[in-house]
Amino acid sequence: MLLGGRTAYLSVLGLITAYAAFTIWYTLTAQLHNPCVYATVSIDSKDGIAAKWEVYNSTIVYAYPENGAKRFSDGLSGFDYVCRENWVNESKLDVLKNMKELHDKVRIVVGTRNCRAYLWSVQLQMITGAWLIYIAFLCLRQERRLLGPFRNQNEFLSPTGYTFNYATYTLATTVLKTHYTKFALLLCEASLRRVALSRTFKRDPIGFLCEHSAALALIGLEVGTHFVARLLVVGTVTLVHTPCSQIYPIYLKLASWGFVVAVTIVEIVAIIYEKPPKTGSSANPPTPATHGVKGLCTSCCSTVLANLCGKLVYLLLVIGAVSILLHYEQRIQIGLLGESFSS
Protein backbone atom coordinates (compact mmCIF):
# COMPACT_ATOMS: atom_id res chain seq x y z
CA MET A 1 0.00 0.00 0.00
CA LEU A 2 2.87 2.38 0.73
CA LEU A 3 4.63 1.77 -2.58
CA GLY A 4 2.39 4.32 -4.29
CA GLY A 5 3.39 7.10 -1.91
CA ARG A 6 5.27 10.21 -2.93
CA THR A 7 9.04 9.88 -3.06
CA ALA A 8 9.49 12.69 -0.52
CA TYR A 9 7.26 11.04 2.08
CA LEU A 10 8.87 7.64 1.57
CA SER A 11 12.26 9.34 1.95
CA VAL A 12 11.16 10.77 5.30
CA LEU A 13 10.06 7.31 6.41
CA GLY A 14 13.46 5.97 5.36
CA LEU A 15 15.24 8.71 7.33
CA ILE A 16 13.21 7.91 10.45
CA THR A 17 14.01 4.20 10.06
CA ALA A 18 17.72 4.89 9.59
CA TYR A 19 17.85 7.19 12.62
CA ALA A 20 16.04 4.60 14.74
CA ALA A 21 18.60 1.98 13.69
CA PHE A 22 21.44 4.39 14.52
CA THR A 23 19.97 5.13 17.96
CA ILE A 24 19.58 1.42 18.73
CA TRP A 25 23.15 0.76 17.61
CA TYR A 26 24.57 3.52 19.79
CA THR A 27 22.50 2.53 22.83
CA LEU A 28 23.67 -1.09 22.60
CA THR A 29 27.35 -0.34 21.89
CA ALA A 30 28.08 2.89 23.79
CA GLN A 31 30.82 2.45 26.38
CA LEU A 32 29.76 5.00 29.00
CA HIS A 33 31.97 4.92 32.10
CA ASN A 34 29.11 6.32 34.16
CA PRO A 35 25.81 6.93 32.33
CA CYS A 36 24.48 9.39 34.93
CA VAL A 37 24.43 13.15 35.30
CA TYR A 38 23.56 14.92 38.54
CA ALA A 39 21.91 18.19 39.48
CA THR A 40 23.95 19.34 42.47
CA VAL A 41 24.21 22.24 44.88
CA SER A 42 26.84 23.05 47.47
CA ILE A 43 26.49 21.74 50.98
CA ASP A 44 25.64 25.21 52.28
CA SER A 45 22.82 25.79 49.81
CA LYS A 46 19.39 26.32 51.33
CA ASP A 47 17.41 25.23 48.27
CA GLY A 48 17.86 23.49 44.94
CA ILE A 49 17.02 26.45 42.71
CA ALA A 50 20.65 27.11 41.82
CA ALA A 51 21.34 23.46 40.97
CA LYS A 52 23.91 22.78 38.28
CA TRP A 53 23.94 19.68 36.09
CA GLU A 54 27.29 17.91 35.93
CA VAL A 55 28.73 14.55 34.96
CA TYR A 56 29.95 12.04 37.52
CA ASN A 57 33.18 13.00 39.26
CA SER A 58 34.94 10.37 41.36
CA THR A 59 36.56 13.05 43.55
CA ILE A 60 33.18 14.42 44.64
CA VAL A 61 31.18 13.15 47.62
CA TYR A 62 27.49 12.96 46.68
CA ALA A 63 24.86 13.22 49.40
CA TYR A 64 21.11 13.04 49.71
CA PRO A 65 19.24 16.27 50.51
CA GLU A 66 18.04 16.76 54.04
CA ASN A 67 14.42 15.97 53.27
CA GLY A 68 15.28 12.79 51.43
CA ALA A 69 14.58 11.50 47.96
CA LYS A 70 11.24 13.27 47.64
CA ARG A 71 13.00 16.37 46.34
CA PHE A 72 14.62 14.49 43.50
CA SER A 73 14.01 15.61 39.95
CA ASP A 74 14.10 12.38 37.97
CA GLY A 75 13.72 11.98 34.23
CA LEU A 76 11.15 10.04 32.23
CA SER A 77 13.09 6.81 31.81
CA GLY A 78 12.17 5.13 35.11
CA PHE A 79 15.75 3.91 35.61
CA ASP A 80 17.32 6.90 37.38
CA TYR A 81 17.46 4.99 40.67
CA VAL A 82 20.68 3.28 39.49
CA CYS A 83 22.40 6.66 39.74
CA ARG A 84 21.74 6.86 43.48
CA GLU A 85 24.24 4.31 44.74
CA ASN A 86 26.95 4.81 47.39
CA TRP A 87 25.73 8.23 48.45
CA VAL A 88 26.10 9.78 51.89
CA ASN A 89 22.92 9.67 53.92
CA GLU A 90 21.24 12.99 54.68
CA SER A 91 21.68 12.37 58.41
CA LYS A 92 25.46 12.78 57.99
CA LEU A 93 25.29 16.27 56.45
CA ASP A 94 25.92 18.06 59.73
CA VAL A 95 29.12 16.07 60.22
CA LEU A 96 30.31 16.85 56.68
CA LYS A 97 29.67 20.56 57.11
CA ASN A 98 32.15 20.66 59.96
CA MET A 99 34.89 18.76 58.08
CA LYS A 100 36.93 21.47 56.35
CA GLU A 101 38.88 19.03 54.16
CA LEU A 102 35.63 17.61 52.69
CA HIS A 103 33.46 20.71 52.79
CA ASP A 104 34.27 21.82 49.23
CA LYS A 105 34.00 18.31 47.82
CA VAL A 106 30.49 17.55 49.04
CA ARG A 107 27.57 18.04 46.67
CA ILE A 108 23.90 17.74 47.55
CA VAL A 109 22.14 15.96 44.68
CA VAL A 110 18.64 17.21 43.88
CA GLY A 111 18.20 15.49 40.51
CA THR A 112 19.50 12.56 38.47
CA ARG A 113 19.34 11.41 34.87
CA ASN A 114 20.25 7.99 33.51
CA CYS A 115 21.47 8.94 30.05
CA ARG A 116 21.58 5.43 28.62
CA ALA A 117 18.01 4.85 29.77
CA TYR A 118 17.00 8.20 28.27
CA LEU A 119 18.08 7.00 24.83
CA TRP A 120 16.21 3.72 25.18
CA SER A 121 13.08 4.78 27.05
CA VAL A 122 12.53 8.33 25.77
CA GLN A 123 14.43 9.05 22.57
CA LEU A 124 13.80 5.71 20.90
CA GLN A 125 10.13 5.69 21.92
CA MET A 126 9.74 9.15 20.41
CA ILE A 127 11.32 7.96 17.16
CA THR A 128 9.13 4.83 17.14
CA GLY A 129 6.04 6.96 17.70
CA ALA A 130 7.02 9.23 14.81
CA TRP A 131 7.61 6.18 12.60
CA LEU A 132 4.23 4.58 13.38
CA ILE A 133 2.27 7.82 13.05
CA TYR A 134 4.04 8.64 9.78
CA ILE A 135 3.03 5.24 8.41
CA ALA A 136 -0.55 5.99 9.48
CA PHE A 137 -0.33 9.30 7.61
CA LEU A 138 0.98 7.55 4.49
CA CYS A 139 -1.85 5.00 4.63
CA LEU A 140 -4.48 7.73 5.00
CA ARG A 141 -2.98 9.72 2.16
CA GLN A 142 -2.77 6.59 0.02
CA GLU A 143 -6.48 5.92 0.51
CA ARG A 144 -7.29 9.50 -0.45
CA ARG A 145 -5.10 9.25 -3.56
CA LEU A 146 -7.05 6.16 -4.56
CA LEU A 147 -10.59 7.31 -3.80
CA GLY A 148 -10.63 10.80 -2.25
CA PRO A 149 -10.60 14.38 -3.55
CA PHE A 150 -7.45 16.38 -4.30
CA ARG A 151 -7.03 19.93 -5.53
CA ASN A 152 -4.16 18.69 -7.69
CA GLN A 153 -5.47 15.84 -9.80
CA ASN A 154 -1.92 14.73 -10.58
CA GLU A 155 -1.95 13.13 -7.12
CA PHE A 156 -4.52 10.58 -8.24
CA LEU A 157 -3.67 6.90 -8.26
CA SER A 158 -5.45 4.35 -10.40
CA PRO A 159 -8.17 2.60 -8.36
CA THR A 160 -7.09 -0.71 -9.92
CA GLY A 161 -4.21 -0.65 -7.41
CA TYR A 162 -6.61 -0.97 -4.48
CA THR A 163 -5.65 -3.94 -2.28
CA PHE A 164 -9.04 -5.65 -2.22
CA ASN A 165 -9.42 -5.18 -5.97
CA TYR A 166 -6.18 -7.05 -6.56
CA ALA A 167 -7.11 -9.71 -3.99
CA THR A 168 -10.53 -10.16 -5.59
CA TYR A 169 -9.06 -10.50 -9.05
CA THR A 170 -6.38 -12.93 -7.88
CA LEU A 171 -8.79 -15.17 -5.97
CA ALA A 172 -11.30 -15.18 -8.81
CA THR A 173 -8.60 -16.10 -11.32
CA THR A 174 -6.71 -18.71 -9.30
CA VAL A 175 -9.41 -20.29 -7.12
CA LEU A 176 -12.65 -19.85 -9.05
CA LYS A 177 -11.05 -19.96 -12.53
CA THR A 178 -13.08 -17.02 -13.81
CA HIS A 179 -12.81 -13.29 -14.41
CA TYR A 180 -14.53 -11.10 -11.83
CA THR A 181 -14.52 -7.39 -12.66
CA LYS A 182 -17.51 -5.91 -10.87
CA PHE A 183 -15.38 -4.62 -8.03
CA ALA A 184 -13.02 -3.01 -10.54
CA LEU A 185 -15.99 -1.40 -12.31
CA LEU A 186 -17.24 -0.08 -8.98
CA LEU A 187 -13.84 1.48 -8.33
CA CYS A 188 -13.88 3.05 -11.79
CA GLU A 189 -17.25 4.63 -10.99
CA ALA A 190 -15.82 5.88 -7.70
CA SER A 191 -12.90 7.31 -9.66
CA LEU A 192 -15.26 9.32 -11.87
CA ARG A 193 -17.04 10.69 -8.81
CA ARG A 194 -13.67 11.52 -7.27
CA VAL A 195 -12.81 13.63 -10.33
CA ALA A 196 -16.08 15.54 -10.03
CA LEU A 197 -15.58 16.13 -6.30
CA SER A 198 -11.99 17.24 -6.87
CA ARG A 199 -13.10 19.92 -9.33
CA THR A 200 -15.47 21.32 -6.71
CA PHE A 201 -12.75 21.02 -4.07
CA LYS A 202 -10.32 22.97 -6.27
CA ARG A 203 -12.86 25.69 -7.08
CA ASP A 204 -14.18 26.21 -3.53
CA PRO A 205 -12.23 24.23 -0.90
CA ILE A 206 -13.87 25.83 2.15
CA GLY A 207 -17.38 25.40 0.83
CA PHE A 208 -16.62 21.83 -0.22
CA LEU A 209 -15.34 20.88 3.24
CA CYS A 210 -18.30 22.55 4.95
CA GLU A 211 -20.70 20.65 2.71
CA HIS A 212 -18.94 17.27 3.01
CA SER A 213 -18.30 16.68 6.71
CA ALA A 214 -16.90 13.17 6.13
CA ALA A 215 -14.26 14.53 3.75
CA LEU A 216 -13.44 17.25 6.29
CA ALA A 217 -12.99 14.66 9.06
CA LEU A 218 -10.80 12.34 6.96
CA ILE A 219 -8.63 15.12 5.53
CA GLY A 220 -8.35 16.61 9.02
CA LEU A 221 -7.25 13.22 10.37
CA GLU A 222 -4.64 12.94 7.62
CA VAL A 223 -3.29 16.43 8.24
CA GLY A 224 -3.37 15.86 12.01
CA THR A 225 -1.34 12.64 11.86
CA HIS A 226 1.19 14.32 9.58
CA PHE A 227 1.50 17.25 11.99
CA VAL A 228 1.93 15.00 15.05
CA ALA A 229 4.59 12.95 13.25
CA ARG A 230 6.45 16.16 12.39
CA LEU A 231 6.27 17.30 16.01
CA LEU A 232 7.74 14.02 17.22
CA VAL A 233 10.53 14.20 14.64
CA VAL A 234 11.43 17.73 15.71
CA GLY A 235 11.11 16.66 19.35
CA THR A 236 14.00 14.22 18.96
CA VAL A 237 16.41 17.17 18.82
CA THR A 238 15.75 17.73 22.54
CA LEU A 239 18.54 15.18 23.03
CA VAL A 240 20.96 18.05 22.38
CA HIS A 241 19.38 20.25 25.06
CA THR A 242 18.89 17.72 27.86
CA PRO A 243 21.29 17.51 30.82
CA CYS A 244 22.57 14.28 29.26
CA SER A 245 24.04 16.21 26.33
CA GLN A 246 27.16 16.66 28.49
CA ILE A 247 27.86 12.95 28.35
CA TYR A 248 26.94 12.23 24.72
CA PRO A 249 29.64 12.38 22.02
CA ILE A 250 29.58 15.13 19.43
CA TYR A 251 28.69 12.78 16.56
CA LEU A 252 25.48 11.74 18.34
CA LYS A 253 24.43 15.38 18.66
CA LEU A 254 25.32 16.04 15.02
CA ALA A 255 23.30 13.00 13.98
CA SER A 256 20.29 14.32 15.92
CA TRP A 257 20.49 17.74 14.29
CA GLY A 258 21.24 16.25 10.88
CA PHE A 259 18.19 13.99 11.10
CA VAL A 260 15.82 16.85 11.96
CA VAL A 261 17.32 19.16 9.31
CA ALA A 262 17.15 16.45 6.62
CA VAL A 263 13.50 15.64 7.39
CA THR A 264 12.64 19.36 7.42
CA ILE A 265 14.29 19.90 4.02
CA VAL A 266 12.48 16.94 2.48
CA GLU A 267 9.14 18.10 3.90
CA ILE A 268 9.68 21.62 2.53
CA VAL A 269 10.55 20.19 -0.88
CA ALA A 270 7.37 18.09 -0.76
CA ILE A 271 5.33 21.25 -0.10
CA ILE A 272 6.98 23.35 -2.82
CA TYR A 273 7.33 20.68 -5.48
CA GLU A 274 4.32 20.36 -7.79
CA LYS A 275 3.74 16.80 -8.93
CA PRO A 276 3.85 16.74 -12.75
CA PRO A 277 0.98 15.23 -14.74
CA LYS A 278 1.25 11.60 -15.71
CA THR A 279 1.75 10.89 -19.38
CA GLY A 280 -0.18 8.15 -21.09
CA SER A 281 -2.16 7.18 -18.01
CA SER A 282 -5.50 5.85 -19.13
CA ALA A 283 -7.65 3.37 -17.34
CA ASN A 284 -9.76 1.21 -19.62
CA PRO A 285 -12.71 -0.53 -18.00
CA PRO A 286 -12.28 -4.28 -17.76
CA THR A 287 -14.33 -6.79 -19.64
CA PRO A 288 -17.88 -7.41 -18.44
CA ALA A 289 -18.38 -10.01 -15.76
CA THR A 290 -20.24 -13.28 -16.10
CA HIS A 291 -23.98 -13.00 -15.39
CA GLY A 292 -26.46 -15.46 -13.92
CA VAL A 293 -26.06 -17.81 -10.96
CA LYS A 294 -22.39 -18.38 -11.64
CA GLY A 295 -21.74 -14.65 -11.73
CA LEU A 296 -23.61 -14.13 -8.46
CA CYS A 297 -21.70 -16.93 -6.70
CA THR A 298 -18.42 -15.65 -8.10
CA SER A 299 -19.21 -12.15 -6.88
CA CYS A 300 -20.12 -13.23 -3.35
CA CYS A 301 -17.26 -15.71 -2.92
CA SER A 302 -14.61 -13.39 -4.30
CA THR A 303 -15.69 -10.43 -2.20
CA VAL A 304 -15.94 -12.44 1.03
CA LEU A 305 -12.67 -14.29 0.48
CA ALA A 306 -10.84 -11.10 -0.49
CA ASN A 307 -11.97 -9.33 2.67
CA LEU A 308 -11.14 -12.31 4.89
CA CYS A 309 -7.76 -12.78 3.27
CA GLY A 310 -6.86 -9.11 3.57
CA LYS A 311 -7.94 -8.86 7.21
CA LEU A 312 -6.15 -12.10 8.09
CA VAL A 313 -2.88 -10.91 6.55
CA TYR A 314 -3.09 -7.55 8.35
CA LEU A 315 -3.95 -9.25 11.66
CA LEU A 316 -1.06 -11.70 11.41
CA LEU A 317 1.38 -8.91 10.57
CA VAL A 318 0.26 -6.81 13.53
CA ILE A 319 0.32 -9.74 15.98
CA GLY A 320 3.75 -10.84 14.77
CA ALA A 321 5.24 -7.35 14.96
CA VAL A 322 3.87 -6.69 18.45
CA SER A 323 5.00 -10.11 19.74
CA ILE A 324 8.55 -9.65 18.45
CA LEU A 325 8.72 -6.11 19.80
CA LEU A 326 7.55 -7.06 23.30
CA HIS A 327 9.73 -10.17 23.47
CA TYR A 328 13.04 -8.61 22.49
CA GLU A 329 12.43 -5.11 23.87
CA GLN A 330 11.94 -6.47 27.39
CA ARG A 331 15.06 -8.64 27.18
CA ILE A 332 17.27 -5.85 25.84
CA GLN A 333 15.90 -3.33 28.33
CA ILE A 334 16.58 -5.59 31.32
CA GLY A 335 20.03 -6.45 29.98
CA LEU A 336 20.97 -2.82 29.49
CA LEU A 337 19.28 -1.07 32.36
CA GLY A 338 18.04 -3.66 34.85
CA GLU A 339 14.56 -3.79 36.32
CA SER A 340 12.60 -0.55 36.57
CA PHE A 341 10.99 0.47 39.84
CA SER A 342 8.03 1.84 37.87
CA SER A 343 7.28 -1.51 36.20
UniProtKB/Swiss-Prot annotation:
Q: What GO terms fall under cellular component here?
A: host cell endosome membrane; host cell Golgi membrane; host cell plasma membrane; membrane
Name the glycosylated positions. Answer: 57, 89
In this entry, the parts of the chain located on the Extracellular side of the membrane are 32-118, 235-251, 325-343
Instruction: Please indicate the ranges of residues that lie on the Cytoplasmic side.
Output: 140-213, 273-303
Family annotation (Pfam families)? Fusion_gly_K
Q: Which domain of life is it from?
A: Viruses
GO BP annotations of the record are: fusion of viral membrane with host outer nuclear membrane; symbiont-mediated induction of syncytium formation
The residue ranges crossing the membrane are 119-139, 214-234, 252-272, 304-324
As for family, the record states: Belongs to the alphaherpesvirinae glycoprotein K family.
Q: What is this protein called?
A: Envelope glycoprotein K
